[in-house]
Amino acid sequence: MAQSQSWARRCFKAFCKGFFVAVPVAVTFLDRVACVARVEGSSMQPSLNPGGSQSSDVVLLNHWKVRNFEVQRGDIVSLVSPKNPEQKIIKRVIALEGDIVRTIGHKNRLVKVPRGHMWVEGDHHGHSFDSNSFGPVSLGLLHAHATHILWPPERWQRLESVLPPERCPLQTGEK
């Protein structure tokens, strides 16, 4: 009887040690390095959710890649919605600070992206709530860079940072 209590106590201690090490490591990893997210809606079709409401892609979000707020034109990023801070949205970076972009339905036909901001759009222009609705987005709202589609298995692929040719900035802020 004493041996079984001793064995149970050792198992419990081992579990607790593992638990109290694994949980902080997992939380730190998910907060600072990477996590997964389900993409809802049609705003990023055909890149994400090409099947519409019948399926939802699950993507890998890399936090580490945007830790210094460094993004490139064409990157698909997750960001805090400028209109609803409780919500995260996934969009494509179209323009960076200093770029001049031709808008689609924005109050100004041309917009120069201010310092510390980016212009983001969904790939499905008629069905996207993006910078054409709310203007340039602060880099401070950047959450992660979407790097891979993980689900469904038949769509597993790396997400390329490709800027649609018709959405290239008219003038870039690069020197």
Swiss-Prot record:
Enzyme Commission identifier(s): 3.4.21.-
GO cellular component: mitochondrial inner membrane; mitochondrial inner membrane peptidase complex; mitochondrion
Membrane topology: Single-pass membrane protein
Pfam families to which the protein is assigned, alphabetical: Peptidase_S26 (PF10502)
Class of the enzyme per the UniProt entry, highest EC level: hydrolase
Cellular localization per UniProt: Mitochondrion inner membrane
GO MF annotations in UniProt: peptidase activity; serine-type endopeptidase activity
PROSITE patterns given in the database record: SPASE_I_3
Description of how the protein assembles with itself and partners: Heterodimer of 2 subunits, IMMPL1 and IMMPL2.
NCBIfam families: sigpep_I_bact
Role summary: Catalyzes the removal of transit peptides required for the targeting of proteins from the mitochondrial matrix, across the inner membrane, into the inter-membrane space. Known to process the nuclear encoded protein DIABLO.
Protein name as annotated: Mitochondrial inner membrane protease subunit 2
Taxonomic source organism: Mus musculus (Mouse)
